[in-house]
Amino acid sequence: MKRDIIACGQKVDIGTRVVLWSEQEGFECPNPRGRNSCSQHDPSLNDAPSEKFKNYKIKNPKTAYQELKENVYQLVLHYDVCYTSSHCHQLMRESPFKGSHFYLDLDGTLFQTCDLYWKTNTAPSDDKKGNERAVHVEISNLSWEALAKESEYYPSKQDKYKKTDKGWKLVLPQEYKTKILKRPFNAIPARTFGERGYFSKKVNGKTVRMWDFTEEQYKSLEKLCIGLNKLLPGIKLKVPFDKKTGRHPLDRLNNYSRFHGVLGHCHVQNGSTGLECKYDPGSAFNWGRLHRAFKKTKP
């Protein structure tokens, strides 16, 4: 069972299952790009239309790894607004430019879609340079699409989470149940809020209502962050935190382009420069949990 994440051929065992793009169950990034800050590839791959995956070749992996460590210092978290990672990949393939280095499925399975040397166009940030400095992970969660009254992409008469004797659980369509590697699997939120189950907070000016991610996702995410810090030390074990209020901010940061660590798409893009305003990983994400996990990690 593979547990490695890879950058320029360098590997780090993160202690949990990682399905690589080269495996039968894996997903190849449909739209990788070259990073402008790195030189060990054909520069025509930087912003050209997507080519066949095999055409993305690293010339000198050793030099490439040094360049990557010098230029990449953020892990950006996203909710994928999908049922599962296979659903997310399906939508990525339909786009001419979208991609993500990692998918994190409901059951905690991580998928790496390409070598981290390559850029994926997932979060341009308000300065339009965000993808150059970042690694991205799409975490399976429907966000507000799970609420029937707010659902736009997947219209339904009932909420997509159901309250049972054992608590809330996501009602997965059959076509997605069979695509999860750990079967059978019940997607249960790690935390719930009161009787309604979902969390509701303002993120970049919008009230975001959503159920939490799963316990399995949080456990794998913690390991991914720690592993990335070993592989790319510029990605510090640090999350946005306001010392004055003692809280984790949910709006775009003033210093978003200089922040070294783990942050959300909401922290780098509020639409102030003409791009779409972003809210992920949303109101339910437990930033405090990551913060505490990082504090316990030995340097």
Predicted feature residues:
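Basic/polar, cationic surfaces and motifs that engage anionic cell-wall
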Residues: 1-42, 68, 149-299
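N-terminal catalytic cores of peptidoglycan-degrading enzymes
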Residues: 1-133, 152
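Carbohydrate-interacting regions of secretory-pathway proteins
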Residues: 71, 135, 144-145, 155
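Sec/Tat-exported extracytoplasmic proteins
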Residues: 79, 114, 138-143, 225-233, ...
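Active-site scaffold segments
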Residues: 101, 135-139, 221, 263-265
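Extracellular-facing segments of soluble proteins and assemblies that are Gly/Ser/Thr-biased and enriched
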Residues: 122, 138-139, 143-150
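Glycine-rich, often proline-containing surface loops adjacent to acidic residues and nearby aromatics
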Residues: 132-138, 143, 197-204
